[in-house]
C-alpha cells in the first residue's frame, strides 16, 4: 500500500511515521508513506497556499492551483483508489472504513487547513471526505495520521500477532474485553480467576460477555446497528 499525504505542515507529522508500527510497516515493505509539502507546488515567489475568500467571509482559504497541481502530478504517476480530504464535515471515520481502505493499493490524503479548501477541489478532485470526529483541529495533519495508522496496522503482516489486531475494539462493533498481566494479585487487586484457569472455551465466553457488557455500558450506540 502507498499513502501520499499532502500538507502545508509536513514537519507536523513526519516524526509520527518514523517510529513504532508505522516505521515497521515501511521497513517490511508493506506500506509506503510519502509526505508532500503543498508549498512545493506553488509558482509565486512567496509560495502562497492560501488567499482571502470571495464574499467577504472570515478566515483564509487554501488555493486551488497548488492542490490541483500536486494531485494531478501524483495521479500522472500511478492510479489511486481514493483521493481523501480531511474535514470536520466529512463522513465519520470508523473501524469499518479503516478495514475497507486497508484493501486499497494507493491513497491520497489531502490535509485541510485554514478555513478550508476552494470548494471546486472538493467538487472535481476529491473522491471521499472523512472526519475523525465532531470537533475542529488546527489542521488535517493529525486526522491524516490517525487514519493512516488505523489503516496500515491491519494490513496482513504489519503486526506480528494478527490475532491481537483482530480482537481490538470495534472490529466486531464491540469494545475489547479487559486485559491483565502478571502479577496475578497486586495489593489485593486480583485478576479474574477464569483467566488463570487455562480453560480456553470458558475464557472465550468470558471475553465475549465482558465485551458485550462494556459496550452496553460505554458505547450502547454500537449495538444499535
Curated annotation (Swiss-Prot):
InterPro entries: Alpha/beta_knot_MTases, tRNA_m1G_MeTrfase_C_sf, tRNA_m1G_MeTrfase_TrmD, tRNA_m1G_MTases_N, tRNA_MeTrfase_TRMD/TRM10. The keyword ATP-binding does not apply. Keywords: Cytoplasm, Methyltransferase, S-adenosyl-L-methionine, Transferase, tRNA processing. It is an enzyme of class 2 (transferase). It catalyses: guanosine(37) in tRNA + S-adenosyl-L-methionine = N(1)-methylguanosine(37) in tRNA + S-adenosyl-L-homocysteine + H(+). Its EC number is 2.1.1.228. It is found in: Cytoplasm. One of its GO terms (biological process) is tRNA N1-guanine methylation. GO terms for molecular function: tRNA (guanine(37)-N1)-methyltransferase activity. S-adenosyl-L-methionine binds at residues 112, 132-137. GO terms for cellular component: cytosol. The keyword Cytoplasm applies. Homodimer. Belongs to the RNA methyltransferase TrmD family. Specifically methylates guanosine-37 in various tRNAs. This is tRNA (guanine-N(1)-)-methyltransferase. It comes from Bacteroides fragilis (strain ATCC 25285 / DSM 2151 / CCUG 4856 / JCM 11019 / LMG 10263 / NCTC 9343 / Onslow / VPI 2553 / EN-2). The gene is trmD.
Amino acid at each position: 500500500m502507498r499513502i501520499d499525504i499532502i500538507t502545508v505542515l509536513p514537519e507536523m507529522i513526519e516524526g509520527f511515521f518514523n517510529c513504532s508500527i508505522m516505521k515497521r510497516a515501511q521497513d517490511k515493505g508493506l506500506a509506503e508513506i510519502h509526505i508532500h509539502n503543498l508549498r512545493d507546488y506553488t509558482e509565486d515567489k512567496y509560495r502562497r497556499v492560501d488567499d482571502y475568500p470571495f464574499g467577504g467571509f472570515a478566515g483564509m482559504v487554501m488555493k486551488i492551483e497548488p492542490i490541483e497541481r500536486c494531485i494531478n502530478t501524483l495521479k500522472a504517476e500511478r492510479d489511486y483508489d481514493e483521493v481523501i480530504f480531511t474535514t470536520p464535515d466529512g463522513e465519520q471515520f470508523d473501524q469499518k472504513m479503516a478495514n475497507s481502505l486497508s484493501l486499497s493499493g494507493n491513497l491520497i490524503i489531502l490535509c485541510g487547513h485554514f478555513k478550508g479548501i476552494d470548494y471546486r477541489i472538493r467538487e472535481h478532485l476529491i473522491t471521499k471526505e472523512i472526519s475523525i470526529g465532531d470537533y475542529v483541529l488546527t489542521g488535517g495533519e493529525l486526522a491524516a495520521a490517525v487514519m493512516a495508522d488505523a489503516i496500515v496496522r491491519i494490513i496482513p503482516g504489519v503486526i506480528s500477532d494478527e490475532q491481537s489486531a483482530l480482537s481490538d475494539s470495534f472490529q466486531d462493533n464491540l469494545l475489547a474485553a479487559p486485559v491483565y498481566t502478571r502479577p496475578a494479585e497486586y495489593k489485593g487487586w486480583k485478576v479474574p480467576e477464569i483467566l488463570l484457569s487455562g480453560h480456553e472455551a470458558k475464557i472465550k465466553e468470558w471475553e465475549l460477555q465482558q465485551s458485550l457488557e462494556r459496550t452496553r455500558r460505554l458505547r450502547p450506540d454500537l449495538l444499535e446497528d
